């Protein structure tokens, strides 16, 4: 009975690690995709893989936040209705808050600098 429980536990750990590895691979692929698209200012194609990385693995890279600002600013400019504008703007403000959560202690861009950038965008 003990060996059956041990076997079940080992199988559960094995499958859990495979799922985690697959998610990591998916995050890496999407991170690479959105980064390359954003570098050439193809924000339309960058948006979907960026959203996947932003929601599924938000601490994977600081580029999620630095390039995310550019992607969302593009999305704001593309808005054709007030609702689209408001949704994209709210998402941009949340992006700044999330950057503070995951990278607020970064010496290159500390929390006060992120808040200053957020305030500047908010007052535009």
Question: Where do the model's predicted regions map?
Answer:
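Basic side chains
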Residues: 2-5, 99, 118
């Amino acid at each position: 009975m003990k060996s059956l429980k041990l076997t079940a536990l080992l199988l559960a750990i094995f499958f859990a690690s495979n799922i985690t590895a697959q998610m990591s691979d998916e995050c890496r692929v999407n991170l690479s995709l959105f980064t390359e698209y954003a570098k050439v200012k193809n924000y339309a194609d960058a948006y979907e893989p960026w959203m996947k990385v932003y929601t599924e693995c938000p601490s994977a890279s600081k580029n999620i936040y630095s390039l995310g600002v550019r992607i969302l600013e593009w999305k704001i400019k593309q808005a054709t209705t007030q609702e689209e504008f408001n949704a994209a703007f709210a998402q941009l403000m949340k992006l700044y808050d999330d950057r503070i959560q995951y990278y607020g202690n970064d010496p290159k861009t500390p929390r006060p600098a992120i808040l200053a950038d957020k305030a500047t965008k908010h007052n535009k």
